[in-house]
């Protein structure tokens, strides 16, 4: 996951699925972004669905409206946006930046393990 991809069609589906899986907040979910630094790739360009609310909004209106507001209007593409909004009820997020070094990755997954124990 990269912040530059935030709000693309895959995210719309992913966030809607997570909302469904929590049963409206009855179940807890831990979201591990495996967030890496932005780069020059254009993988996050698939946001045209946000310009077609008649086709896409009906599947999960709160998620669609949230992403349209943040991506199209505010031009704000950061996973932190969804974390602070509370759109995925009863969710905990592991959003530390994941780097390539072996020691850093071991630390990353150790921290993730601690979060699962909570």
Model segments located where?
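Class I S-adenosyl-L-methionine-dependent methyltransferase catalytic core
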Residues: 1-118
């Amino acid at each position: 996951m990269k912040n530059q991809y935030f709000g693309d069609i895959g995210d719309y589906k992913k966030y809607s699925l997570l909302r469904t899986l929590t049963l409206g907040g009855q179940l807890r979910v831990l979201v591990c972004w495996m967030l890496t630094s932005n780069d020059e790739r254009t993988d996050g360009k698939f946001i045209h669905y946000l310009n077609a609310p008649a086709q896409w909004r009906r599947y999960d209106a709160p998620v669609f409206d949230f992403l349209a507001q943040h991506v199209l209007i505010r031009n704000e593409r950061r996973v932190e946006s969804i974390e602070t909004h509370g759109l995925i009820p009863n969710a905990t997020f592991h959003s530390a930046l994941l780097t390539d070094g072996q020691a850093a990755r071991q630390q990353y997954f150790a921290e993730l393990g601690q979060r699962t124990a909570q």
